[in-house]
Swiss-Prot record:
Single GO term (MF): acyltransferase activity, acyl groups converted into alkyl on transfer
Enzyme class, UniProt record, top EC level: transferase
EC number assigned by the record: 2.3.3.19
Xref: InterPro entries: AIPM/Hcit_synth_CS, Aldolase_TIM, LeuA/HCS_post-cat, NifV/FrbC, PYR_CT
Pfam families reported for this sequence: HCS_D2, HMGL-like
Metabolic or biological pathway: Antibiotic biosynthesis
Organism: Streptomyces rubellomurinus (strain ATCC 31215)
Keywords carried by this UniProt record: Antibiotic biosynthesis, Transferase
Residue stretches making up the Pyruvate carboxyltransferase domain: 5-256
Catalytic activity: 3-phosphonopyruvate + acetyl-CoA + H2O = (R)-2-(phosphonomethyl)malate + CoA + H(+)
Gene3D superfamilies: 1.10.238.260, Aldolase class I
Coiled coil: none
Function: Acyltransferase involved in the biosynthesis of the phosphonate antibiotic FR-900098, a potent antimalarial agent that acts as an inhibitor of 1-deoxy-D-xylulose 5-phosphate reductoisomerase (DXR), the first enzyme in the nonmevalonate pathway for isoprenoid biosynthesis. Catalyzes the condensation between acetyl-CoA and phosphonopyruvate to yield (R)-2-(phosphonomethyl)malate.
Protein name: 2-phosphonomethylmalate synthase
């Protein structure tokens, strides 16, 4: 895995393509600010060809390109890219399909058109001094030999990077890594991973692509995006930091704050068990786990919650043990009598089953006081 990896967040483009999600100009600005504050240095901001408020937002941030690389996304239409360059943007992306099926269904063109269009658009944008990124979309259903040919054409034209998009998440990690390696062996160009989560493998595929030599990778906050979403910013960044010793300069303590901002904007809740940013990631209920945590907090946590802006919680419930009941009472200023703990534990478990959830400290105190009376 390289040491010069570059994260690019696409919450404002692919993330907003989540069915039912629409960000206002003000919301997109707030998300952009939060990403930059967290240390994200490359951000795909939207699609100028949509016009309206989308274009208003894009125009409003053209003077902020010194804060992060701001990438604008385009169809395979030369005039679209030219308009973005005329606005003053210096980083452009062109989305083009490479599979025969997508070429026929999406743009009604063939591969002769594709190669000519890709070459022309890259050369035009490079002649104007832009950083040029271009897609190979639907790589799972594109022959590896054609991916290599396409990579050679866009590299020769001067493209700065090739985005390998597993558009409907059909690849496993081994197959995704194989395609990255095949492209890198055939062309002198940086590769960007763009993995969708239809089989729950977007994070694994992104890491596999990076291990195969890709430099860039796409993520979204909370993994939002088309259908099942894509690779999650927090998951990939923390995995790189904790498992692969790659520090991308992201302020991990801001991950949960950014996650909640985007969740509210998208009208979605963050699942309690969402890795890294979910509320249950550092929550403990079962007796064995809580007992171990009281002795050594590394027993049942991969890293301290404060590393990612989280908090440790202990939850009273059906699976709790006496140690957790005693601890909870002590938190309420009560030194529990040892002989009352078995009864209190039995009552906590029974109440948890009746209400179908966690027992509050107030309910525990009531149970204890009745037993002690």
């Amino acid at each position: 895995m390289r040491n010069d990896l570059v994260l690019e967040d696409t919450t404002l483009r692919d993330g907003e393509q989540t069915p039912g999600v629409a960000f206002s100009k003000e919301t997109k600005t707030a998300i952009l600010n939060a990403l930059i504050e967290a240390g994200v240095t490359s951000i795909e901001i939207g699609i100028p060809a949509m016009g309206g408020e989308e274009l208003d937002f894009i125009k409003s941030v053209v003077d902020r390109q010194d804060e992060a690389r701001l990438v604008v996304w385009h169809r395979g239409v030369r005039e679209d890219v030219e308009r973005s360059l005329d606005l003053g943007f210096t980083s452009v992306h062109v989305g083009l399909p490479t599979s025969a099926g997508h070429l026929k269904a999406s743009v009604r063109k063939d591969r002769t058109w594709l190669l000519a269009t890709a070459r022309d658009m890259v050369k035009m944008a490079k002649d104007r001094g832009a950083f040029v990124s271009i897609s190979a979309e639907d790589i799972a259903r594109t022959e590896i030999s054609f991916l290599q040919e396409y990579a050679g054409v866009v590299a020769e034209a001067g493209a700065d990077r090739l985005r390998l998009s597993d558009t409907v998440g059909l690849l496993g990690p081994e197959a995704y890594g194989e395609r990255v390696a095949a492209v890198l062996s055939a062309a002198d160009i940086d590769v960007q991973c763009h993995a969708h989560n239809d089989f729950g493998l977007a994070t694994a595929n992104t890491l596999a692509g990076l291990k195969a030599g890709a430099r860039y990778f796409h993520v979204t906050v909370n993994a939002i995006g088309e259908r099942a979403g894509m690779a999650d910013l927090a998951q990939v960044v923390v995995a790189l930091k904790k498992l692969y010793d790659r520090d991308l300069g992201i302020d991990l303590t801001k991950l949960k704050k950014v996650s909640r901002l985007v969740a509210e904007a998208a009208g979605h809740q963050v699942l309690p068990w969402q890795p890294i940013t979910g509320d249950n990631v550092f929550a403990h209920e079962s007796g064995i786990h809580a007992n171990g945590m009281f002795r050594d907090t590394s027993s049942f946590e991969p890293f301290p919650p404060e590393h990612v802006g989280g908090e440790r919680r202990y939850v009273l419930g059906k699976h709790s043990g006496r140690a957790l009941v005693a601890w909870a009472l002590e938190q309420e200023g009560i030194t529990p009598r040892e002989e009352l703990l078995p009864h209190c534990l039995e009552e906590v478990r029974a109440l948890s089953i009746r209400i179908g959830g966690a027992v509050s400290h107030e309910q525990l105190v009531e149970i204890y006081n009745k037993a002690a009376a």
